[in-house]
Amino acid sequence: MNQKQHKRSAFSGKIGFVLSAAGASVGLGNIWRFPYLAAKYGGGIFLLIYIILAFTFGYTMIVAETALGRMTKKSPVGAFASFGKTGGLSFGGWINAIIPILIVPYYSVIGGWVIRYLADYIGGHGSELAADGYFSAFISSGPSAEICFAIFTVFTLSIIFAGVRNGVERVSKVMMPILVVLSVVIAGYSVTRPGALEGVKYFLVPNIANFSWMTVVTAMGQMFYSLSIAMGILVTFGSYMKKDVSIEESTENVEVFDTAIAIMAGLMIIPAVFSFSGGDPDTLQAGPALMFITIPKVFESMGLGTVVGILFFTLVLFAAVTSSIALTESAVSTFEDELGWDRKQATILIGIIMLVLGSLSALGYGPLARFTVFGMQFLDFFDFLTNSVMMPIAAITTCLLVSRVIGVEKIEAEVTLDGKPFRRKRIFNFMIKYLCPIFAAIILVSSVANALGVISM
């Protein structure tokens, strides 16, 4: 490893960290995945379980990863290696570092889809987006999907070139407040549609009759998507955090911000779908197709559908961008630390990786459709590998590092550097030692079992 030293970047303060970390968390996992999972797994009961997990499981992992990063001032590989270079510790650091490198290419492909939809709405082609077969025709087109992916990738890389404070932080400070305003406006419009209040009730009021074990497992899995845990981002962002910034308060800000946006996303989509379909179960459980196939049909049935479509896909684009720059920044930080490269060199390398792996996903439903990995298209395979296998393993290794190697006392010392008490210390200690690794193991086993057809999620 090249040990050439470089001056470590830093956020300007608490607001910079919170908005950047919230930007990393508030991505397609909130706007796209959360609403369709809530619709599929019982609405209000899913939301209740998710909130409980966010303020226990999610909170613990955010504190642990952020403290680990700030304590070592290193990206995941170096952070883990700071406490020993045994095989297990080295593996934990590398798996946390590799995850964003594998996610951001296919994530950028989906970001490219969002660009295409936004452009079509701006061009007044909303009725075409609502037509049957539009989405499948677009993603199988090859060149069109590749161009949109390339545009999104270049935009992401241009922000990373600008650095942590002038790029990641500045963009997050601009986009996140706009995202909040757009979510409130769209949710307000959605819940006032005829028949939408039934959707509000379904989403917000827990119904124990809708409870199942899979509701809990799925809500656990959503934690990884929604809070950006176990993918190296929070370790990296923690390494950019100043010592006088409160880790616990910042974590609370991030979890509240993230959960609020997830709820707003549910209020944007579920009531609108109820208004459109009358609560038809098949429509509610459309899964990933909900945003790109069902929602355009919903907007087409509304008054001001084109305007709402523009606002909605602008919001989704902002969410995708803030998350993609966080993923890319984590990868760049790893290359800088482990290879001793400067930001320009590291950004060019991740750019090449994004274009190569992303092109496989962008073309995987078209010219490369006949090539699959374990029966999955490239995008689906990378998504399964990272989110269902690698991230739970990364979470387990982080829990073991903190609880068995570093010791919770050192984490507490890092958290209280600002002079304030660690208010949820008991919850943190219990979760990181016992429940968090168990939860991560459950997610890993259930995800693999689902892929093998043993269970159905």
For each predicted feature, which ranges?
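Membrane-embedded translocation segments of transport machinery
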Residues: N2-K7, F11, E169, K173-V321, ...
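Extracellular loop-to-transmembrane helix junctions
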Residues: A38-A64, S144, M390-A394
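Helix-loop-helix connectors at the membrane interface of multi-pass transporters/channels
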Residues: N2-K4, G78, G111-S140, M241-D244, ...
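Inter-helical loop and helix-membrane interface segments of multi-pass membrane transporters/permeases
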Residues: Q5-R8, Y36-Y41, P76-I95, S108-R165, ...
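A generic transmembrane alpha-helix motif of multi-pass inner-membrane proteins
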Residues: L379-L400, R423-M457
